[in-house]
Amino acid sequence: MFSNKENINILTALLVEHGVTRVVVCPGSRNAAIAHNLSRVRQITCYAVTDERSAGFYALGMAQHRYEPVAVCVTSGTALLNLAPAVAEARYQQIPLVVISADRSPAWINQQDGQTLEQPNALGQWVSKAVSLPEPLDAEQRWHCNRLVNEALTACKRYGGRPVHINVPVSEPLFCFDVDRLPQERSIRVIEAVEDTVACKAFEEKLWAARRPLVVVGQLHADEAYQVRLSVEEICKDVPVLYECTSLSPDYTTGDAASGKATGPLNINEVLSRIERATTDVSPDYILYIGGTLISKRLKQYLRQIHRAETWTVNRGGHIYDTFMTLSGVVDGRPAYVLQHICKTLREKKEQQSLTFDSGYQQCWSAAIDAGKASTKDVATGYSQLSAVKAFFEQLPTDRPYYLHAGNSMSIRLANLFARSYVWCNRGVNGIDGSLSTAAGFSLVAGYDVFCIIGDLSFFYDQNALWPTLNRNLKVLLLNNHSGGIFNTLEGLEDSETCRQLMKAQHQLSAECACRQYGLTYLSAHNANELKAGLMAFLDRSNQQPVVFEVFTDSDADTTAWQNYHRQT
């Protein structure tokens, strides 16, 4: 039996119609009727997560797996506000996230009643659509409720994915479950038109007229990153292409995730060092920027200094991202489609021998990129986080697929040096909050092992991610140097002892007790020998529980290893 609240039944029916199959549910009385309905629908699987902030990132991680809408359902009051970090991340990553918040009747808002605040539009600009449903009393109000839910769920799936907010006022009595079936609801569909090749002409004319073009690939969804990788492998023979571990992906459906066939890893610092030492001017005159944010600050700084370059960017939604300060135009489209079209034209021009690119420029960049790939292989460092991450990637199995997540700050930068395959990372806003919860949520719906490389501050900040029941496929490599190590790399900060004390957040915490409490296998290492032995146990397929491998290092040694690595390369 279902709830007797008509707006809840309309919402439940339309979630099914729009293909929402997973909902993360947080405890509460006001949203209990919604949770009851969702749990009664065979097409929907519910996941219980108590911490709302963690729950938002759990849902984000699930949505990242297939880039299909995932909902998170919370009670009224500040529970909704706790979802804001995950919603902001979903917006900038273009992830389809559906926020469902229960609410009191509008008559009781701001009347000193319990657990109330003004919930409609509480998530502001971070959602692409926010609706507050009526509690229908007649046919017109039912039509209105249906339309609002359709508006939100169609907006969620546009332009690759967007977060939306559906607020559901529920008047008392809350708990009456006497409806035997859900209503048959009208489902409104939005069909995306086929890409028009004519739209590519404007920016392509500039590309083929350029002498020194450069392609830069930022963060992409994993499914599109695979298609882009195939095009990049063809384009890079004639045009230099810079990418990162969040840019290109192997084919997970064929087990290519761990095969090493992906294009990478690439040390961009080494590439740019060689380019800057070139005896002739090899700066690009045309930049095609594909995808989202970049990890490398140095790359952004380098490209911002090239004032005469013309930059075009490709993204879903046609957003004006003037990252390099030389933006000339924006292509509103799928990056994979645009690159496929470029490949087709490139083949035609090569057959016609009509390419006018500067061959010396291409040769110089090609040599620098080859050096950037080779420089990641032979790195001499003492025991440190860098050596631990390098050893992890060297021992990762090549005979089975896996998924790889990384936290922000140093974790993603270290992964970017050595990862052979695509890395999921919350680079939309780049916060340290929610990285562990995102990986944990991802692991609940993934069929392969999910590895998460994460720093200590990010781990302890988000350790409630370990609270829900987890699958055995989650494996966390925790890099613990008892502080925010990335602050050691910020030039000038060492001159402020006060800032170092406040910003580095030094501590003496260990994850051991948390792992024991939540029923996870715990491993640790304090030196190179323990690291080697620990990695073997960490990667053992016979593990029956989620695993946390905590690698303890010295913060100063980590800084020295990082600096020495960049001096070597």
Model segments located where?
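Phosphate/pyrophosphate-binding active-site segments
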Residues: M1-F2, Y302-M410, E512-A514, H526-T569
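N-terminal cofactor/phosphate-binding cores enriched in small/glycine residues
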Residues: F2-A88
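Active-site diphosphate/adenylate-binding microenvironment
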Residues: I8-L11, V16, S29-R30, I34-L38, ...
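A short, small-residue-rich loop immediately preceding and capping a beta-strand
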Residues: T21-V24, T45-Y47, H65-R104, V282-G291, ...
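Glycine-rich, anion-gripping cofactor-binding loops and their flanking helix/strand elements
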Residues: N82, V217-W312, R420-A446, F460-N464, ...
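Thiamine diphosphate
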Residues: I100, A107-P120, L417-T569
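Glycine-rich, acidic loop regions that bind phosphate or pyrophosphate groups
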Residues: S101-A152, Y243-S366, T469-N471, L490-E491
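Conformationally flexible catalytic loops at phosphate/diphosphate-handling active centers
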Residues: L148-E151, A155-A209
